Design a protein with these regions (language model features):
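N-terminal leader/linker segments that initiate helical-solenoid repeat arrays
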Residues: 24-71, 75-77, 260-266
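Terminal, low-structured helical/coil segments at or just beyond the last alpha-helical repeat
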Residues: 27-43, 214-266
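Structural marker of alpha-solenoid helical repeat scaffolds
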Residues: 42, 76, 110, 144-146, ...
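Canonical tetratricopeptide repeat
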Residues: 52, 86-89, 120, 156, ...
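Register position in tetratricopeptide repeats
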Residues: 59, 93-94, 127-128, 163-164, ...
Length: 266
């Protein structure tokens, strides 16, 4: 998965985004300062604010600045587990796997039952080749009655079960994500389209892909590549050409387009 794709999950744009703190910093006005000045009131609040800033910078494609903000957060409050969890995601995107593991472990030590920490660590495991191990952490996240976005953990569980070759488990998780989602579950729909494609159920795959594409602007290279292969399987050369044209125009350097040029359709 690309760094952009990971950040998209965090931002809630695609598929099963990883869950981090909402970007809603809390400030109090300093009565001794001007009306324009805002200062955080305590170490925990400072840690929260800088963690949220780190999340924002990461989503905006500035991992270096994000790490600076998270360092400030942890300097303010070394026990603020959310900062470790978010820093783990940033380091995962930078392929600093050992450091990411350390951050997630620290977050889990501080908050072993926190749903967001479990979800994020599960994604780390999935992205580092431990797909089967990741499922337990997604399911642990789902145990919390206070978890506000269980559809994300179900989507991640489905995505990782699919990567592990467990098509039945993946399908069940993704269908649960659809039931619980309040934002259309575009990622879950795309993953279901992939599962049905692998199973040879091309009509069902087409339905889920069409639903996912309606929610994407622009469509991802991944979705266009699946659409191209679906049309090819069904002998629709015009449809295949349309997807190929979009893939070439939008993502000429993508791995998907390179596979197309090589004729590797599976």
């Amino acid at each position: 998965m690309t760094i952009f794709s990971l950040k998209s999950r965090i931002a809630g744009v695609f598929l099963g985004a990883l869950c981090i703190l909402p970007v809603q910093a809390q400030y109090e006005f300093n009565p001794s300062a001007t009306g324009q000045s805002k200062v955080p009131t305590d170490p925990r609040n400072r840690a929260k604010i800088h963690t949220e800033l780190g999340s924002m910078y990461f989503q905006a494609g500035n991992p270096g600045v994000a790490l600076d903000e998270l360092r400030i957060a942890l300097s303010a409050d070394a026990g603020y587990f959310q900062a470790y969890s978010v820093r783990g995601l940033v380091r995962l995107s930078l392929k600093e796997y050992d450091k990411a593991e350390d951050d997630f472990r620290q977050a889990l030590n501080l908050a072993p039952n926190d749903p967001e920490v479990n979800n994020n660590y599960g994604w780390y495991l999935c992205e580092t080749g431990k797909e089967r191990q990741s499922i337990a952490y997604f399911l642990n996240a789902l145990k919390s009655p206070l978890y506000e976005t269980p559809d994300k953990a179900y989507t991640n569980a489905g995505t990782c079960a699919f990567k592990a070759g467990d098509f039945d488990g993946a399908q069940n998780y993704l269908l649960k994500a659809l039931q619980l989602s309040q934002d259309g579950a575009v990622s879950a729909r795309l993953q279901l389209a992939k599962i049905f494609y692998k199973r040879g159920n091309f009509e069902e795959s087409r339905i889920y892909l069409a639903e996912a594409l309606k929610m994407m602007e622009p469509p991802t290279a991944d979705a266009l590549w699946l659409g191209l292969r679906l049309e090819r399987k069904q002998g629709n050369r015009a449809g295949e050409g349309g997807y190929a044209s979009q893939l070439r125009g939008r993502y000429p350097t993508s791995p998907e387009y390179q596979e197309f040029l090589k004729g590797n359709f599976e």
